[in-house]
Amino acid sequence: MKKGTVLNSEISSVISRLGHTDTLVVCDAGLPIPNSTARIDMALTQGVPSFMQVVDVVTREMQVEAAILATEIKQQNPQLHETLLTHLEQLQQHQGNTIKISYTTHEQFKKLTADSQAVIRSGECSPYANVILCAGVTF
């Protein structure tokens, strides 16, 4: 049995194949996922697993150098926005690097998902609970 933190074989596989600046999306249950992009569907029911549960597990195994969020999260989901920013702050301290955070419109965000290595769908049912994680290097 795998000893690492990620037991899901699809998530483990996609993270292991990420190169520098490749992207991986963690999204809520409602984000449209392009047919051309790999979908890893973790959603079991509303809220299970939560967006932050998925982000937490993914970022334990993935080196993150940047994160992209939809601007709308600031107004439409401020509590989750703050939780995510706190998580990313703690992650950069743990990794020993600065994680660049940027924002774009939700419409542009949806277009950017098409270039991702995969989209991991959570069971989150709150607005704009989506992040594009950009892979860094560990050296």
UniProtKB/Swiss-Prot annotation:
Gene3D superfamilies: RbsD-like domain. The keyword Chloroplast does not apply. The active site is at 20 (proton donor). GO terms for biological process: D-ribose catabolic process. InterPro entries: D-ribose_pyranase, RbsD-like_sf, RbsD_FucU. GO terms for molecular function: D-ribose pyranase activity; intramolecular lyase activity; intramolecular transferase activity; monosaccharide binding. The keyword Chaperone does not apply. Substrate binds at residues 28, 106, 128-130. Its main location: cytoplasm. It comes from the Bacteria. It catalyses: beta-D-ribopyranose = beta-D-ribofuranose. Keywords: Carbohydrate metabolism, Cytoplasm, Isomerase. Pathway: Carbohydrate metabolism; D-ribose degradation; D-ribose 5-phosphate from beta-D-ribopyranose: step 1/2. One of its GO terms (cellular component) is cytosol. Its EC number is 5.4.99.62. It is found in: Cytoplasm. Homodecamer. Belongs to the RbsD / FucU family. RbsD subfamily. Catalyzes the interconversion of beta-pyran and beta-furan forms of D-ribose. NCBIfam families: PRK11797.1. This is D-ribose pyranase. The lineage of its organism: Bacteria, Pseudomonadati, Pseudomonadota, Gammaproteobacteria, Enterobacterales. The gene is rbsD.
